């Protein structure tokens, strides 16, 4: 045993019976268990409720046998932990089915990390059944699992039933416009979901037209990441209009899409009306100087935005100047970080930056290859925009 503990004779006898049952289910004959199996086994758990954990382990092993999969020893060790990390374990759909039967009755796990397990739609459907019944799990990472539209549909339906979920990560799952309809339904129905990560998918302009109205009506989400998708054209504009009407979202990452000048103009209009958003990342969105000027119209009046990242956009020094001039013209601006990384600026911009710092001494302006420090803590989605030396 990994740690010493004292139990009554009755508890020890019950534990021994449970251990033998586990051995049978895992294919190990009782005769081969040996007395030491009770003391040094991968199935053993620690704590005063060890017997209950063994019962749950037995259920998991029975399910593994039924689905012809090898049990995951780290799950048996972490079964009573609040955070269950099973990323990169190669579970597949069958492994997900075996796991789901145990999770549905597990009262301990609050955060579940199943990133990169090849779950596919079938595995997501199995887990959705467990999530619809769990009252304890509120944070799930299912990124990089090839979930597709079938997986998205199952998960969104499950979360609509169970309002316990607070954070869901679905990055890198090949989600396209068909999945956007189910995601939109989730945004409309789930009022307690606070954080949603849809980055690195294939959400296109049609998806933007679907998600935009849902974002406008959503009444709970505070952090949304849709970076590295294909939002452009009318879809980007529709999405931005959803932001304009939303009154809950505080953090939005739309970097590495194709908003372009029309999308930037729509975001500018949104910033005129939105008095809640605090952090916005629009890096690499094909925004020219003209789009930057349109975006700046929102900065002239907005009083809540603290962080704006527009790095790697072809807006040149003229666009950067226009944005900064808009900030200068807004004495009520709350901006603390304005990031123009990888955009070269001229002396005229530098002069304006000096003047703005006199008005807003707390404002950090980042340009070109210049290394500056922004000392206040950022949410994880924005930390990549800062130099490695900046405290996280």
From Swiss-Prot:
Which Pfam families would you find in this protein's record?
Answer: LRR_6
Q: Where is region (Disordered) located?
A: 24-46
User: Where, in residue numbers, are the LRR repeats?
Assistant: 106-129, 134-157, 162-185, 192-213, 220-241, 248-269, 276-297, 304-325, 334-356
Record flagged with keyword Translocase: no
Q: Tell me if Cytoplasm is a UniProt keyword of this record.
A: no
Listed A to Z, the keywords are: Leucine-rich repeat, Repeat
Give the source's domain of life in one word: Eukaryota
Record's InterPro entries?
Leu-rich_rpt (IPR001611), LRR-containing (IPR052394), LRR_dom_sf (IPR032675)
The protein's name in its UniProt record? Leucine-rich repeat-containing protein 74B
Source organism of this protein record: Homo sapiens
């Amino acid at each position: 045993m990994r740690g010493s503990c004292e139990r009554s004779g009755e508890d020890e006898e019950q534990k021994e019976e449970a251990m033998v049952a586990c051995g049978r289910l895992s294919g190990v004959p009782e005769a081969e268990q040996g007395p030491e199996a009770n003391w040094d086994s991968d199935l053993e758990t620690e704590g005063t409720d060890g017997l209950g954990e063994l019962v749950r382990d037995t259920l998991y092993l029975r399910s593994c046998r039924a689905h012809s999969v090898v049990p995951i020893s780290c799950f048996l060790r972490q079964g009573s932990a609040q955070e269950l990390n099973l990323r990169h374990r190669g579970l597949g759909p069958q492994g997900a089915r075996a796991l789901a039967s145990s999770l549905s009755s597990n009262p301990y796990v609050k955060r579940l990390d199943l990133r990169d397990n090849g779950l596919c739609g079938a595995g997501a459907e199995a887990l959705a059944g467990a999530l619809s019944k769990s009252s304890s799990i509120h944070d799930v990472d299912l990124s990089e699992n090839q979930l597709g539209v079938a997986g998205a549909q199952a998960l969104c339906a499950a979360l609509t039933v169970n309002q316990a979920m607070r954070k869901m990560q679905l990055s890198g799952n090949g989600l396209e416009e068909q999945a956007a309809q189910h995601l939109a339904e989730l945004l409309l129905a789930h009022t307690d979901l606070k954080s949603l990560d849809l980055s690195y998918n294939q959400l296109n302009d049609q998806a933007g037209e679907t998600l935009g109205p849902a974002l406008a009506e959503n009444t709970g989400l505070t952090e949304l990441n849709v970076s590295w998708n294909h939002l452009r054209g009318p879809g980007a504009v529709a999405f931005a209009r959803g932001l304009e009407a939303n009154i809950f979202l505080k953090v939005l990452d739309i970097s590495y899409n194709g908003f372009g000048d029309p999308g930037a103009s729509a975001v500018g209009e949104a910033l005129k009306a939105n008095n809640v958003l605090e952090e916005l990342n629009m890096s690499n969105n094909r925004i020219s100087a003209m789009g930057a000027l349109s975006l700046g119209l929102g900065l002239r009046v907005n009083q809540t935005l603290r962080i704006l990242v527009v790095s790697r956009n072809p807006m040149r020094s003229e666009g950067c100047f226009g944005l900064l001039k808009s900030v200068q013209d807004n004495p009520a601006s709350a901006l603390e970080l304005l990031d123009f990384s990888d955009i070269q600026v001229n002396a005229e911009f530098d002069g304006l930056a000096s003047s703005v710092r006199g008005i807003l001494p707390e404002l950090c302006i980042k340009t070109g290859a210049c290394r500056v420090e922004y000392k206040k803590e950022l949410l994880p989605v924005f930390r990549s925009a800062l130099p490695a030396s900046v405290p996280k």
